[in-house]
Regions:
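Long, hydrophobic N-terminal alpha-helical segment
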Residues: 1-19
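Flexible, active-site-adjacent loop/turn segments at secondary-structure boundaries
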Residues: 2, 48, 66
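A domain-level signal for the structural core that forms small-molecule/cofactor-binding pockets
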Residues: 6, 43-45, 92-93
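Short, low-complexity, intrinsically disordered N-terminal segments
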Residues: 14-27, 60-61
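Sterically constrained small-residue positions within well-ordered secondary structures
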Residues: 18-20, 41, 64, 77
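Short, structured protein-protein interaction patches enriched in aromatics and acidic/basic residues
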Residues: 22-53
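C-terminal structural segments of small proteins and small subunits
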Residues: 59-60, 64-94
């Protein structure tokens, strides 16, 4: 399953506020040419949900969850801002 760091969850929460997302809405990873994008959507049955301070901030459907099984979402500081980044998680013992 995708691993998400606490700073990344906080960044997702701030992004939802900035976008004016209504209660019950969260960011969902979607495939796009050359990578991934985040869209504000409602939670669907079967989604994997990640929360921050009691609010769902990130959603993955089953297909995306499988594709991101060996990845970590983290926040990287760039100047005064933080950016969300994905990286492959190192497997131990392989």
């Amino acid at each position: 399953m995708l691993s998400v760091t606490k700073p990344a969850l906080k960044r997702l929460s701030r992004r939802l506020v900035r976008k004016g997302a209504a209660d019950g809405m969260a960011l969902r990873f979607k495939r796009r040419e050359g990578g991934w994008t985040l869209r504000v959507e409602h939670e669907s049955p079967g989604d994997t949900a990640f929360s921050h301070d009691g609010r769902t901030v990130l959603l993955l459907d089953a297909e995306v969850s499988k594709a991101m099984a060996d990845m970590t979402l983290y926040a990287r500081k760039v100047g005064q801002r933080s950016q969300l980044k994905l990286r492959r998680t190192e497997r131990r013992g392989d």
